[in-house]
Amino acid sequence: IVDSPNVNAFALPGGYIYITRGMLAYLNSEAELAAVLGHEIGHVTARHSVRQHSAETTTNVIGTVVSVTTGIQGVDELTGMVGTAIVRGYGREHELEADRLGAEYMARSGYDPDAMLEVIGILKDQESFEKKRAKEEGREPNVYHGLFSTHPENDARLQEVVGAARQHKTGASMRINRDGFISALEGLHFGESESEGVIRGNRFYHESLDFTLAFPTGWQIENRDDRVVAMAAAGDGFMQLKKMKLDKRMHARSFMQEELKLGGLQHGEQIRGNGLTGYTAIASGKTPFGTRPVRHIVLMRDTTAWIITGAAADRRDPYRYDRQIIASARTFRALASQDGQKARGNRLHIIRAGDGTRYRDLAAQAPLERYAEEQ
């Protein structure tokens, strides 16, 4: 299981099959889980990765398995390592073949192959929501690669492969196990987990690293594998936070010069507050907008350096966001007792719906800040 909120599943050569916890959160029965896994097993047994990729690519993919099992957290990182096709899909014909094999495996194993059709509706709704959200947030959508996401529910070919699988049923009663599966989801992390850090409004919390930082209000924040990145609402401002572990304590200015290799520091000054010492200066550097004057801020806590950088796109006004970036850096602090709940990720709680249960009422009670009802 990949610790990612994205809704996806994929197979690697050698029979390694992965499903994200984000996918688990939207399934409603053991049979639906079997449908997703059956589809991915179909890719393995049909050797789609071998048929589509070169021997060199396949070798690289197999080599990533160790990396995957020892620290890869998200589907986006895996995409960069193993290639787009494995995570995003193999094309219409291969996806349909994986569905055919998956439905047959389900029936032979005692699961109702019709659950594959149930998954289609779930994932189509999820894909529509994800595309809408990605457009509003100015990013690429993360969607499941299978035929579930590319075919409408009444697609004749998919209906045919599921129908053909029914002949392999092992008995009159097929396993679905809705209640048992849903009960097992109680307490599952939903969205970001505290092990990777949690975004609440414009503030980022990280429980295990014991810190919080408020980014400029209105900026879009993205928690990546090795850094936290924020972009101004207009897309013309950039800020990021990284950390580096040191062998010994250093002065922040010395760290900039010796470890970051920054030369030509301008407008340098010390920063103190919240139990931290630091240093800030301007130096030319690479940004998403090209080479620009970059605000560098280093905060030292014991033998850990917290590195904050920021820049603006406009060459005529390169310091447009400078005050906001510095003000944001000054909010960096250790977690306080009142931060405990905010620093913990959300978890699924299973309730039994009644005649009067409404999505809007549940959404009002949920701790989700955005898109509560849609999710």
Where in this protein do the model-derived segments appear?
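A Zn2+-metalloprotease active-site environment signal
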Residues: 1-175, 183-186, 190-206, 212-215, ...
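Short hydrophobic beta-strand segments that form the core of ligand-binding sensory/regulatory domains
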Residues: 18, 305-309
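Surface-exposed amphipathic alpha-helical segments
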Residues: 34, 168, 221, 308-345
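Extracytoplasmic/periplasm-facing segments of secreted or lipoprotein envelope proteins
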Residues: 199-215, 280-283, 343-346, 350, ...
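K/E-rich alpha-helical interaction surfaces of small helical-bundle regulatory domains
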Residues: 214-228, 301, 329, 333-336, ...
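Short, surface-exposed polybasic-and-hydrophobic patches located at secondary-structure transitions
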Residues: 231-243, 346-355
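Signature of long, low-cysteine stretches enriched in small and polar/charged residues
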Residues: 240-242, 256-306
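Primarily a LysM-type cell-wall glycan-binding module
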Residues: 340-371, 375
